[in-house]
């Protein structure tokens, strides 16, 4: 009888352990479910991609956190070129040509910059993708510039990119951080 009691006690302990470890409070939610809880103060290297036909469009970036800082007009100044991430310029890899604002962008790798404004942003696709921050940015290398209006959203702690596509041969590149979202429509 003691062996059976010990076995039942072990089973109950294991079940309790499993059920308590799978329950998450809101403070335990991960930025990426494949990573441990996000407690880092660093800008995490991140990527996003989406399929356009049989090919994938990809964005590589570093994802800074808000961390109780003033972002717009503070950490990220208004009316200045920004890498729209951290560290290296955000890169956009296109397996095929797309059009943004009726400007054809051929297949290749590009940098994605923005100029945040209080009511309007400028999104820039630039030929020189391999650069640190915006210190090497050269307007002469711009492929296209698009004016967009920022949208208000719920708080997002870490900067995130999204690529949304549709069956209509169109899509959007979106950047979300703090309480703002910008979207750039494209066609392929």
Identify the meaning behind each predicted range.
Residues 1-27:
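Bacterial Sec-dependent N-terminal signal peptides
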Residues 6, 106-108, 113-116, 161-169:
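Short, surface-exposed loop and linker segments with low hydrophobicity and enrichment for Pro/Ser/Thr
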Residues 7, 72, 99-101:
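Alpha-helical interaction segments
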Residues 19, 119, 142:
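Residue-level signal for beta-strand positions within conserved beta-sheet cores that form or flank
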Residues 24-75, 80, 134-188:
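Primarily secretory-pathway and cell-envelope proteins
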Residues 81-131:
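Mid-length scaffold segments of soluble, non-membrane domains
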